[in-house]
Amino acid sequence: STATDSSYYTNQQHPAGGGGGGASPYAHMGSYQYHASGLNNVSYSAKSSYDLGYTAAYTSYAPYGTSSSPVNNEPDKEDLEPE
C-alpha cells in the first residue's frame, strides 16, 4: 500500500514539476497532500496499535485509581473541616 502511494506521488510530482511555473506550487501542494494522506493512513494503523496498548495499560490503572476513590475522600474531609 505504501509503495503504491509513494510511486503515485513520484509519478505525479514529475509531470507537475515540469508542467507550468505558476501552477507548479499548486500542483506540488496537491501532490504533497496526497502523499501526506497515504502516510497518515500508515500512521493511523500504527497509532491504532499504540492506542490499543495505551488504552489497555490505562484500563489496568483505571480500576486501581477508581478503587482508591480519592475524589470521594475530598468531600468527606471537607465535611469534617467545617464541623
From Swiss-Prot:
UniProt cross-references to Pfam families, sorted A to Z: DLL_N (PF12413)
Keywords on record: Activator, Developmental protein, Differentiation, DNA-binding, Homeobox, Nucleus, Transcription, Transcription regulation
Any coiled-coil regions, as ranges: none
Cell compartments where the protein resides: Nucleus
Polar residues bias spans: 1-14
Record GO cellular component, one term: nucleus
Key word Nucleus present: yes
GO process terms (BP): branching morphogenesis of a nerve; cartilage development; cerebral cortex GABAergic interneuron differentiation; cerebral cortex GABAergic interneuron fate commitment; embryonic cranial skeleton morphogenesis; embryonic skeletal system development; forebrain neuron differentiation; GABAergic neuron differentiation
An example Gene Ontology molecular-function term: sequence-specific double-stranded DNA binding
InterPro entries attached to this UniProt entry: Distal-less_N
Superkingdom of the source species: Eukaryota
Role according to the record: Acts as a transcriptional activator. Activates transcription of CGA/alpha-GSU, via binding to the downstream activin regulatory element (DARE) in the gene promoter. Plays a role in terminal differentiation of interneurons, such as amacrine and bipolar cells in the developing retina. Likely to play a regulatory role in the development of the ventral forebrain. May play a role in craniofacial patterning and morphogenesis.
Family named by the database record: Belongs to the distal-less homeobox family.
Name of the featured protein: Homeobox protein DLX-2
